[in-house]
């Protein structure tokens, strides 16, 4: 079989159509397929003329309604995006130095943000009412937290062993030996550090306790006067003048899962009858060439199967500026003016049509709402780790989310996805300037969501959590190590955000959000320091002689005190704060029905197992987060990788590589404490034995087989598994369908396969006008690529080729027209198997 015949056989057309094509050479085939019979000055440009025909062979249902257009040079191009209507969106530089702002005010250059009143008098009165209520509630939270912390800290002070604080006089130590003075002060310095750390950590735990408690009361009562969801009755027709864009920024994600979830979401929107009010934008920042081609294929299949021409769009940026936030900003600049609202979706997001329509209705009913965040439920994973985390977030999450809403009201969080945003104020106020200066805490903002919410509120718009709106879903990382990879990026981002704590005009609630974001990760090194100082105090007590006399001519010795009954009482009180939210969560489920969680006994057993699991993982996370915080301050680079979205298990080698140092620390710590005092080892046992077991817990919990076994036993069962909503059932069905027809090695197929080359050529974005300089550059790229083996062609050079329709056409022609000359490419491609289901069957294509 000659190469021309082989080329024709690779086309998804009927045998009769193949027989009608010329077998003389490759150029003749492309000329025969070119309905316009164009003449090309170069023979290796001839594939450009057959792009339309080759696309119609493979994806005839995707080319309706003018999907195929001509660029300025007359080349065929897929209309993957609507015409841009640009808006101005530029950030104001950050002024993080309060001294500099004070100097500006002295010079009459006040930079306080200003905004115009947008509400009627009645709306302003309603707005002022909930803001006053929110302020009062937050003062109550502050008083409760601080009072509880003061009492606990004073109690902690009374049970520490060395109580001679008042007898220490620095002047008496001036004339004595330095070592003697140091040994006298050492226990008290350690105790002071312990006490300060205890106060900070207890305050952090106390705030979480009161948040969960108020969330429990909100959910138990079932009525919330200030819930934003109560502002609509739920069935109002959508305003045709207010259109909504569903935007999904993606970067090197699992293409099958992305498009399965997106299709399920769109099908659910269509089922509501409101699809005409929505458009979908897939905003790709992918830089893996194979994934880029797979995304193009998946988009073509999606618009064909759901009839999404003119409503579902795809764009891949060639310049990845500011990562996800830059991708969203780029959408706003080009197409944002065409929409009143946008819903931001993550790659693993799935939302029902009712939820999306509900968010739009809430926006229309609340004209001063800038962002409304839904409360996504975690589901869809099968590993033991993910199922345990799904159960935890499903059981405990509603309490904390409702509690956050209780304290924050319309000055709340935005989590970056599954939320609706009012586009105009977002464009005007939420562009993010890079943080000034140098170092690891300067440059592009990593965790953009909290900052965008703060800027929206600074401009006078409300930020709400619709915690009681159902139909919003997401997925969790499948194992501990993948979760920690994500946490490292979040840790760095939250530490960066704290630089904005003193920025002018930020609402106190969002300053608190920045603070809690930092404490989410800074609490780990603080806890580690607390444990380290406690251990050091025990070492001092065991190995040194107590200093009974701290003053000259002191009549009575100061004896170290050990009051285990008080220590146990304080420990029990702290455990109540930590675990009472879990108990309240299960109590709420017991009151409202346990059937969807597997029944009374199974949900109770699941709770106990989850508590054990969280105890085992807490010290492991503590050490990892400590390393992340230290890394951020030392300026170690954070790699921005997309998290693992599928059920991926951790190997033993990877586990011991990541957890080996923790295992060693746990062993040394345990042996040392056992040698010093077995009683102290009892208190440290949950910490040290969790570290020793960390590699084993990490591996076993990452296994999908173990997770599926617990699912069969109805442990860690959640309502979405007991009675899956249709949108999740559809997601699983579409995911299986996509996996069966998935495309691997997309770049090589885009070079060789007639259909995928036509697709890549039609979707290439570098469509410049012809020039001699450009032709020289194109020839250089093609020659350099073909003169090397495909293995040596790096990612960046592949992306350059993939972005230019002319280079893709020329590559395609040359490897088929001169296989002997480019034998390394041909041999490499012959070793690649094309999934037979990746393209339509010839008999189906001919019907």
UniProtKB/Swiss-Prot annotation:
Belongs to the glycosyltransferase 2 family. OpgH subfamily. It is an enzyme of class 2 (transferase). It is found in: Cell inner membrane. It comes from Escherichia coli O6:H1 (strain CFT073 / ATCC 700928 / UPEC). The keyword Membrane applies. GO terms for cellular component: plasma membrane. Signal peptide: none annotated. It is a multi-pass membrane protein. Residues 1-138, 217-511, 591-602, 703-847 are cytoplasmic. NCBIfam families: PRK05454.1-1 (NF003955), PRK05454.2-1 (NF003958), PRK05454.2-5 (NF003962). Involved in the biosynthesis of osmoregulated periplasmic glucans (OPGs). Keywords: Cell inner membrane, Cell membrane, Glycosyltransferase, Membrane, Transferase, Transmembrane, Transmembrane helix. This is Glucans biosynthesis glucosyltransferase H.
């Amino acid at each position: 079989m000659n190469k021309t015949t082989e080329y024709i056989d690779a086309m998804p057309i009927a045998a009769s159509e193949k027989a009608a094509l010329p077998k003389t050479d490759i150029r003749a085939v492309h000329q025969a397929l070119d309905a316009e019979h164009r003449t090309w000055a170069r023979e290796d440009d001839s594939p450009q003329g057959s792009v339309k025909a080759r696309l119609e062979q493979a994806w005839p249902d995707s080319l309706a309604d003018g999907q195929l257009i001509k660029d300025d040079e007359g080349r065929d191009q897929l209309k993957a995006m609507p015409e841009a209507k640009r808006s101005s969106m530029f950030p104001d530089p950050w002024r993080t130095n309060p001294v500099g702002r004070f100097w500006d005010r002295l010079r009459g250059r006040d930079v306080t943000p200003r905004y115009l009143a947008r509400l009627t008098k009645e709306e302003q009165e309603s707005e002022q009412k909930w803001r006053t209520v929110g302020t009062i509630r937050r003062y109550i939270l502050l008083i409760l937290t601080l009072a509880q912390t003061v009492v606990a800290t004073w109690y902690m002070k009374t049970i520490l062993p060395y109580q001679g604080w008042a007898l220490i006089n620095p002047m008496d130590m001036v004339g004595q030996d330095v070592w003697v003075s140091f040994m006298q002060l050492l226990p008290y310095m350690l105790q002071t550090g312990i006490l300060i750390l205890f106060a900070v950590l207890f305050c952090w735990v106390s705030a979480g306790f009161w948040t969960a408690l108020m969330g429990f009361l909100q959910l138990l009562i079932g009525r919330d006067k200030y819930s934003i969801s109560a502002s609509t009755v739920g069935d109002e027709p959508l305003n045709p003048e207010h259109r909504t864009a569903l935007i999904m920024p993606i970067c090197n994600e699992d293409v099958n899962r992305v498009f399965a979830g997106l299709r399920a979401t769109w099908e659910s929107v269509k089922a509501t009858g409101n699809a005409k009010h929505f458009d979908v934008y897939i905003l790709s920042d992918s830089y893996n060439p194979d994934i880029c081609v797979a995304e193009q294929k998946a988009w073509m299949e999606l618009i064909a199967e759901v009839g999404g021409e003119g409503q579902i769009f795809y764009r891949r940026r060639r310049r990845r500026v500011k990562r996800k936030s830059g991708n969203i900003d780029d959408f706003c600049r080009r197409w944002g003016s065409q929409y009143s609202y946008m819903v931001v979706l993550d790659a693993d997001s799935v939302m029902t049509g009712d939820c999306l329509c509900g968010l739009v209705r809430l926006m229309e009913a609340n004209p001063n709402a800038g962002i409304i965040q839904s409360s996504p439920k975690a589901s869809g994973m099968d590993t033991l780790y993910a199922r345990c985390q799904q159960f935890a977030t499903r059981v405990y999450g509603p309490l904390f989310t409702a509690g956050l809403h209780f304290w924050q009201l319309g000055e709340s969080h935005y989590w970056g996805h599954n939320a609706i945003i009012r586009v105009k104020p977002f464009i005007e106020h939420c562009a993010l300037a890079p943080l000034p200066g140098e170092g690891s805490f300067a440059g592009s903002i990593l965790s953009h969501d909290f900052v965008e919410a703060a800027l929206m509120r600074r401009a006078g718009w409300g930020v709400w959590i619709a915690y009681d709106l159902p139909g919003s879903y997401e997925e969790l990382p499948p194992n501990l190590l993948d979760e920690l990879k994500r946490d490292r990026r979040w840790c760095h981002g939250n530490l960066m955000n704290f630089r904005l704590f003193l920025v002018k005009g930020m609402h106190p609630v969002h300053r608190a959000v920045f603070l809690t974001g930092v404490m989410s990760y800074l609490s780990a090194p603080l806890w580690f320091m607390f444990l380290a100082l406690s251990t050091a105090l025990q070492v001092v007590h065991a190995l040194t002689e107590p200093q009974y006399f701290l003053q000259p001519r002191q009549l009575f010795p100061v004896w170290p005190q050990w009051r285990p009954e008080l220590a146990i009482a304080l420990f029990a009180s702290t455990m109540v704060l930590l675990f009472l939210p879990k108990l309240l969560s299960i109590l709420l489920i017991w009151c409202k029905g346990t059937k969807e969680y597997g029944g009374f006994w199974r949900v109770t057993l699941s709770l106990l197992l989850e508590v054990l699991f969280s105890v085992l993982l807490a010290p492991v996370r503590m050490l990892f987060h400590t390393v992340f915080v230290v890394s951020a301050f030392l300026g170690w680079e954070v790699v921005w990788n997309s998290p693992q979205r599928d059920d991926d298990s951790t190997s033993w080698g990877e586990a011991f590589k990541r957890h080996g140092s923790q295992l060693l620390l746990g062993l040394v710590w345990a042996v040392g404490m056992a040698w010093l005092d077995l009683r102290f080892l009892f208190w440290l046992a949950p910490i040290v034995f969790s570290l020793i077991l960390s590699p084993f817990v990490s591996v076993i919990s990452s296994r999908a087989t173990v997770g599926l076994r617990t699912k069969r036993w109805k442990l860690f069962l959640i309502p979405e598994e007991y009675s899956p909503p249709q949108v999740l059932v559809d997601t699983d069905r579409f995911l299986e369908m996509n996996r069966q027809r998935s495309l691997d090695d997309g770049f090589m197929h885009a070079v060789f396969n007639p259909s995928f080359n036509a697709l890549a050529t039609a979707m290439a974005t570098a469509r410049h006008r012809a020039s001699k300089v450009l032709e020289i550059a194109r020839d250089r790229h093609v020659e350099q690529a073909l003169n090397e083996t495909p293995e040596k062609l790096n990612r960046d050079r592949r992306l350059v080729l993939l972005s230019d329709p002319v280079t893709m056409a020329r590559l395609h022609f040359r490897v088929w027209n001169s296989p002997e000359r480019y034998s390394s490419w041909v041999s490499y491609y012959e070793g690649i198997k094309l999934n037979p289901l990746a393209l339509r069957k010839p008999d189906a294509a001919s019907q």
